[in-house]
Amino acid sequence: MIILVKRRKKWLSFTLTAGAALLLTACGGGNEEASDNNAGTDGEKVSIEFWSFWGSGLRRDAIEEIIEDFNTSQDEIEVEYVYQPWGDIWTKSLASIAAGDPPDVIVQDINSVQQRAEAEQSTNIQEYIEQDGNEMESTFYPHLWETVFYEDNAYALPFNTDTQVLFYNKDAFEEAGLDPETPPATWEELEEYARALDVKDGNSWERIGFYPLWNLGADVWALNADNGVSWFDKEGNVKINTPKKVEALEWVLEWQDYYGPETINSYEAEFGNGVADPFISGLVGIRAQNINYYTNLLENAPEDFNFGVAPLPEYEEGSGNWSWGGGFVLEIPKGAENPEASYEFMKYLTSTEVQEKFGLNSFDIMANQEANTNLIEHPDLDEEGQMIYEMADRNLESTVITPVPLKAPDFSPLVNEQIDGAMLGNQSAQEALDAAQASVENLVEQNQ
């Protein structure tokens, strides 16, 4: 289903305090269990430390109020929130684990859960899940739940995720004679639409219809073309130089040749945030982007900015609207003093009510399936916001998560350097992916 949205001035009537009473319910169910796990004794609260990189804006406001709700709704666990800057949080976490003084709960990358579990940097939480009757599995989207396991034991709980989609300028569509209610459905149509949207004055491009590598990588288009198979398949086999992936890289190179590297580089030099965003400013007609990009439009686009959202187009009709997603999980670092209390807080953060609240204030795609479903028709979201969540929920059905293989944790540079060589004209797409295939196969062999 295609979601078509129009900019509204009042996008969200929900306020942070409005959901406080509702959130007490999410915590209430965990009080007795926390007591059973001896989280607190003699009437004293167990103090735990929670690290994340949400340091400003709506996410910080939301998480701080969620923590306050948790702390005041029960008398056994007290959570202290510690902001750590993006990039620093994980190096500091490793240092704290090595020093024997880690935080109690931390937000971590969803694609590297197995690496941390294998390295004994995180805590096995399987026993806590089993004590709850294995009810957690049904809470989350299946492809997210699969990421938290190492050797059949869970080491994390999924928190949020994302998915890549197309944003397109509906007014530009009308100007170019395109139907604004019918975005491109295949790669062939995407090319046709982009050519119609292009505006050129002499040798100068006033508008570029679409360029596939602005905001997405070649890896996303490769899996889109290859039936959702990324550089590795589900069995861990290296699948870099498949025919479809070679065709995908050739397709990307054709886009670069059409506009020219100089044009692409000069456009990129003009890109910025806010009103300088190339999609908002009209420099680009169609933009492939994480669906959370919607928050940027809410904050910076004019009130009358008229845009649509659609799935990434199929490689060819019937091949599937495959997309890529990432996300984050909640983990208990190895050596945390109070894992029972930590797990209770993690359950709270992934409960339906709390996930709804965080989603309402961030437009993150939450890991809790029921929370996302509720947000589709949530009364505190306007029609536009509800449509974004409906689009996200549907798109997750064809969204692929790509956990880093244990036998090739450092494979990405080997692939990227070959793709870069092709983009620079030093080798063909076939040569680039053949070389990447050989290099990664060698890496896997070394790590057997």
Show where each model-derived region lies.
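Extracytoplasmic "Venus flytrap"/periplasmic binding protein-like
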Residues: 65, 69-143, 174-177, 182-185, ...
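Extracytoplasmic/periplasmic solute-binding protein
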Residues: 150-159, 164, 174, 188-241, ...
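Long, aromatic- and glycine/proline-rich binding clefts that accommodate carbohydrate-like moieties
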Residues: 75, 143, 310-311, 360-413
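Glycine-centered hinge/linker elements that transmit conformational signals in sensory
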Residues: 193-195, 237-266, 312
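Extracytoplasmic/periplasmic substrate-recognition and gating elements
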Residues: 68, 72-73, 78, 176, ...
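Hinge/lid segment of periplasmic solute-binding proteins
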Residues: 110-165, 222-224, 306-310, 377-384, ...
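Conserved C-terminal helix/tail region of periplasmic/extracytoplasmic solute-binding proteins
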Residues: 174-175, 180, 199, 394-448
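Short, low-complexity disordered leader/linker segments with a strong preference
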Residues: 1-49, 72, 431-434, 438-448
